[in-house]
C-alpha cells in the first residue's frame, strides 16, 4: 500500500513547566525541541511500519527546515516540498497531567493541490491546510477530484469553536468527499456547533451530514466512537499503567495506525475489522502519549536510517 499525506511539518518546542507560570517571573521547565506537525507525524508513524509514504508539506530553506527535511529523510519519508518563506513552529505547553496547549506559528500550504499524488492507494489530509483560507478551497477541490480507487481520510485541525470557521471547514470537507473523517471530541463539537452529549451521538450526527464518510470521534482516555456507512461502534481507550506525559501527536499516531490497519481492506470495512483497527489505533496513541515529543519512538517501531 502507498500513502500520500498532505499536511504541515513543524519544529516543535515542548515545554513542561515545574509549576504554574508566574506573570513577569521565571519558572524552571523541561524544554525539548523536536520534529512535529500533524501531517509529518502521521507520515513518520506510517513509515516506521514499513509503509511507503509521501509527504506534501511546506518547508523553507532555513535552519529549521533543513533539520526537518533531514529528520524525515532518515525516517524513510519521501518528501514533496512546497517551498515556503519560513518553516512553521509550534510551542506545546504541557501541564501536570500531560495535556498540551499549543501556541502555533503555522505556514500556509500554498500550491499543495499541484503536488499531491492522487493515484496513491490512500490519501490523508491534515486539517490545518484544509482549514486555512489561503489553501483550503483549492485543496478541497483537488481532494474531491481524486481517483475513485484512492481512499481519502481527513483529520480535524484544532477547529475554532466559532460558527464561521467551523462551517467553512465543514463545507470544504463536504467538497473533498472523504471516505474517513477523524475528529477529536472538541473538534466534533465545533464541527456541529453544539455538544451532542456523547461521542457516539456526535459521530452519528456528523455522519448524517457527511453520508459518504465513516466518521470517527476520539477522546483520548475517553475512547472513541465510529458511525456511518452502516456502522456504529464504540471502543474503550487502551489502558496503560504509566501516566500520560505528553498528548502531542497521540491523535496523529491514532490516525496512522487506523490507516495502516484499514488500508488494503474492502470499503466500508467490516465491523470486526474496524473494531480491531480502533483498538490498535488507541493502543499506539496511548503509548505515544507516554513519551515526550510528537514523533518520539515507541517500542516496536522501526529505527531510522543511518
Model regions and ranges:
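Residues at secondary-structure transition points
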Residues: 26, 30-37, 63, 86, ...
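Short, conserved phosphate/pyrophosphate- and ester-handling motifs at nucleotide-, phospho-/glycolipid
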Residues: 46, 184, 251
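Ribokinase/PfkB-type carbohydrate-kinase core domain
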Residues: 1-9, 70-82, 94-234
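Glycine-rich phosphate/adenosyl-contacting loop at the front of the ribokinase-like
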Residues: 1-56, 66-70, 244
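Conserved phosphate-binding/catalytic region of the ribokinase-like
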Residues: 3-4, 167, 195-306
Amino acid at each position: 500500500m502507498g500513502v500520500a499525506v498532505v499536511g504541515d511539518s513543524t519544529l516543535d518546542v515542548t515545554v513542561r513547566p515545574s509549576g504554574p507560570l508566574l506573570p513577569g517571573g521565571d519558572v524552571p521547565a523541561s524544554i525539548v525541541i523536536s520534529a512535529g506537525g500533524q501531517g509529518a507525524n502521521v507520515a513518520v508513524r506510517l513509515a516506521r511500519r514499513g509503509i511507503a509514504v509521501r509527504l506534501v508539506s511546506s518547508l523553507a530553506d532555513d535552519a529549521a527546515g533543513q533539520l526537518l527535511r533531514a529528520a524525515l529523510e532518515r525516517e524513510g519519508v519521501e518528501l514533496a516540498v512546497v517551498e515556503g518563506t519560513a518553516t512553521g513552529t509550534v510551542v506545546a505547553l504541557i501541564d501536570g497531567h500531560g495535556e498540551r496547549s499549543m501556541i502555533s506559528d503555522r505556514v500556509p500550504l500554498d500550491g499543495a493541490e499541484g503536488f499531491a499524488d492522487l493515484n496513491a492507494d490512500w490519501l490523508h489530509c491534515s486539517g490545518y491546510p484544509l482549514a486555512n483560507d489561503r489553501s483550503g478551497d483549492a485543496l478541497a477541490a483537488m481532494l474531491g477530484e481524486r481517483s475513485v480507487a484512492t481512499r481519502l481520510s481527513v483529520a480535524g485541525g484544532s477547529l475554532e469553536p466559532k460558527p464561521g470557521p467551523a462551517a467553512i471547514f465543514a463545507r470544504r470537507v463536504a467538497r473533498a468527499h472523504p471516505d474517513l473523517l477523524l475528529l477529536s471530541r472538541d473538534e466534533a463539537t465545533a464541527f456541529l456547533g453544539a455538544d451532542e452529549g456523547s461521542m457516539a451521538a456526535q459521530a452519528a450526527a456528523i455522519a448524517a451530514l457527511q453520508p459518504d464518510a465513516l466518521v470517527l470521534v476520539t477522546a483520548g482516555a475517553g475512547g472513541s466512537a465510529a458511525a456511518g456507512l452502516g456502522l456504529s461502534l464504540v471502543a474503550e481507550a487502551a489502558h496503560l499503567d504509566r501516566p500520560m506525559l505528553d498528548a502531542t501527536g497521540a491523535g496523529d499516531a491514532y490516525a496512522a495506525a487506523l490507516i495502516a490497519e484499514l488500508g488494503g481492506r474492502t470499503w466500508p470495512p467490516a465491523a470486526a475489522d474496524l473494531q480491531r483497527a480502533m483498538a490498535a489505533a488507541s493502543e499506539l496513541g496511548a503509548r505515544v502519549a507516554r513519551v515526550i515529543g510528537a514523533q518520539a519512538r515507541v517500542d516496536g517501531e522501526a529505527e531510522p536510517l543511518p
